[in-house]
């Protein structure tokens, strides 16, 4: 007879197997892929700020990055929001307005990844650290925003997420709860858990090819994805302006502007399919 602990362990293992199967189907087999499509590789792409820099989105870690104007602790932590929500909302309102300027458009790198998804279908997954919507505007649909999305807000009490394109003020409240609660940016701040991690790690365990684009290799857990992918046998590729902090982990590397190296690599990959 199983002990209570044994029952819990058995139930945990069954639930884990079920989760793995659900995620596997969600990521790569949503439309019951036909047999000939099975020959196509499962490709997992990670993008960082470098892919959007050429579209005019300022990066966080560059010399002229956003943190020049504000301390990280003031605008990108839960504690900063608690201290001065108006400052935090003003900061993200400016970023939101910038993103919606007509000159901010997907560049050739974004468009190349949309083309890659078109070729691979549900055997393609894009994970981005960026909070802009340039991947979606380029045509990508299978996207996980692990650090949140700038054009969304969420209830600070229930966590309910809402689409939001305008400014947010301290007077704006979410009415999904019994008592109206303040809205906060739908952005993962320092000290908070990134979004979609179960799905991401499942995809890493199944990927045939892992490609990192425009990432610094400074921020974990994303900086550790290449190691995780290698453990499961994936071929790893870095496409970056310069070698990242984890550049030596990659089997294949190409350096230059994202708008140049990403389309070139995608064309090379598509020719091999």
From Swiss-Prot:
Molecular functions (GO terms): histone deacetylase activity, NAD-dependent; NAD+ binding; NAD-dependent protein de-2-hydroxyisobutyrylase activity; protein-malonyllysine demalonylase activity; protein-succinyllysine desuccinylase activity; zinc ion binding
Residues given in the record as substrate binding sites: 92, 95
Residues given in the record as NAD(+) binding sites: 48-67, 129-132, 214-216, 240-242, 258
Alphabetized Gene3D superfamilies for the sequence: SIR2/SIRT2 'Small Domain, TPP-binding domain
E.C. code: 2.3.1.286
Main location: cytoplasm
Broad EC category: transferase
SUPFAM superfamilies (alphabetical): DHS-like NAD/FAD-binding domain (SSF52467)
Alphabetized UniProt keyword annotations: Cytoplasm, Metal-binding, NAD, Transferase, Zinc
Superkingdom, taxonomy of origin: Bacteria
Comment on bound cofactor: Binds 1 zinc ion per subunit.
Cofactor(s) the protein requires to work: Zn(2+)
Annotated catalysed reactions: N(6)-acetyl-L-lysyl-[protein] + NAD(+) + H2O = 2''-O-acetyl-ADP-D-ribose + nicotinamide + L-lysyl-[protein]; N(6)-succinyl-L-lysyl-[protein] + NAD(+) + H2O = 2''-O-succinyl-ADP-D-ribose + nicotinamide + L-lysyl-[protein]; N(6)-(2-hydroxyisobutanoyl)-L-lysyl-[protein] + NAD(+) + H2O = 2''-O-(2-hydroxyisobutanoyl)-ADP-D-ribose + nicotinamide + L-lysyl-[protein]
Active site per database record: 147
PROSITE patterns in UniProt: SIRTUIN (PS50305)
GO cellular component: cytoplasm
Positions annotated to bind Zn(2+): 155, 174
Domain Deacetylase sirtuin-type, first and last residues per copy: 20-272
Pfam families noted in UniProt: SIR2
Subcellular location per the Swiss-Prot or TrEMBL entry: Cytoplasm
NCBIfam families: PRK00481.1-5 (NF001755)
PANTHER family on file: NAD-DEPENDENT PROTEIN DEACYLASE, NAD-DEPENDENT PROTEIN DEACYLASE SIRTUIN-5, MITOCHONDRIAL-RELATED
Function according to Swiss-Prot or TrEMBL: NAD-dependent lysine deacetylase that specifically removes acetyl groups on target proteins. Also acts as a protein-lysine deacylase by mediating protein desuccinylation and de-2-hydroxyisobutyrylation. Modulates the activities of several proteins which are inactive in their acylated form.
HAMAP family from the UniProt entry: Sirtuin_ClassIII
Name listed for the protein in its UniProt record: NAD-dependent protein deacylase
Classification of source organism: Bacteria, Pseudomonadati, Pseudomonadota, Gammaproteobacteria, Enterobacterales
């Amino acid at each position: 007879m199983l002990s209570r602990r044994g029952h819990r362990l058995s139930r945990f293992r069954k639930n884990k197997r079920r989760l793995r199967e659900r995620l596997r189907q969600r990521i790569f087999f949503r439309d019951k892929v036909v047999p000939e499509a099975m020959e196509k590789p499962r490709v997992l792409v990670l993008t960082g700020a470098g892919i959007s820099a050429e579209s005019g989105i300022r990066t966080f870690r560059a010399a002229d990055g956003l943190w020049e104007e504000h301390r990280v602790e003031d605008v990108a932590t839960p504690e900063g929001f608690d201290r001065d929500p108006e400052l935090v909302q003003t900061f993200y309102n400016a970023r939101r307005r910038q993103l919606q300027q007509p000159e901010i458009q997907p560049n050739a790198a974004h468009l190349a990844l949309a083309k890659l998804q078109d070729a691979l279908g549900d055997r393609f997954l894009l994970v981005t650290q960026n909070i802009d919507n340039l991947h979606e505007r380029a045509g990508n649909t299978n996207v996980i925003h692990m650090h949140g999305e700038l054009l969304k807000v969420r209830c600070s009490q229930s966590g309910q997420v809402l689409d939001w394109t305008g400014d947010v003020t301290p007077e704006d409240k979410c009415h999904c709860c019994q008592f109206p609660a303040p809205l906060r940016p739908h952005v993962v701040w320092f000290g908070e858990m990134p979004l979609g991690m179960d799905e991401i790690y499942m995809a890493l365990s199944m990927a045939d090819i892992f490609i990192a684009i425009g990432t610094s290799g400074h921020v974990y857990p994303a900086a550790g994805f290449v190691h995780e992918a290698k453990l499961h046998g994936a071929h790893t590729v870095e496409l970056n302006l310069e070698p990242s902090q984890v550049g030596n982990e990659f089997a294949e590397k190409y350096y230059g502007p994202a708008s140049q190296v990403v389309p070139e690599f995608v064309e090379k990959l598509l020719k091999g399919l």
